[in-house]
Amino acid sequence: MSYQDILVFLDDGTTNATRVNTGFKLAKQHDASLTGIALATMKPRKVKTDSSMVRRRMSQEMAEKLVAEFTSQAADKGVNSKTIIIAGDADESTLKLTHYSHNYDLLILRQPNPDHENYSRLTQLSETVLLKSGRPILFMPYIGTDKCPGERVMITWDGTASACRAVHNAIPILQHAKEVVLVIVENDKT
């Protein structure tokens, strides 16, 4: 069992390069296609403006820059790639990202850095995709990114069919893990 389609989240955070390189490595390892996805709804870091029109334009430009860099790197590394830019408000873009995630074998997301200007937005986005995608997610930490991803794996389990599918779909990562931690989420369904 291997992955055919991998989705990696692109942003202007300090861990973007590590996350993208992990995506390239996994795509090569599994002979998979790698899709880079950027949100044109994120306020670029260090931008100070109250104008929503300026913020939207700068967000779109940032997303275009991220996908251009990703496309160039993918070509240099010989990785089959695609890109997606999601526009819309915060809730709409989160919903779109969740829907896109259903089409991929593995998602590579980031743990939000509390020092990032978009921390609350990234937290909401990550939590929603994590809980609603039903897909295995390689959740890259904002610290310790020099460690080999996939050695320590956490499975969140709530007893649902989507949790079962996600665990089954994560078998290619689980086979190589040195440690697997199971977190059971109890609710009225379990």
Model-derived features: positions:
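Structural beta-alpha unit
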Residues: 1, 72-107
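Small/aliphatic-rich secondary-structure junction motif
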Residues: 1-53, 132, 149-190
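A conditional alpha-helix N-cap/helix-loop micro-motif detector
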Residues: 16, 63, 87-90, 119, ...
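Gly/Ser-rich helix-loop-strand patches that form or flank binding pockets
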Residues: 16, 20-28, 96-145
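N-terminal positively charged helical leader segments and presequences
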Residues: 33, 48-87
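A structural preference for short, hydrophobic beta-strand core positions in alpha/beta folds
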Residues: 36, 83-85, 139, 182
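Generic structural signal for helix capping and beta-alpha/helix-loop junctions
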Residues: 44, 91-93, 116, 147
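Short, small-residue-enriched loops and turns at beta-alpha junctions
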Residues: 88-91, 115-116, 187-190
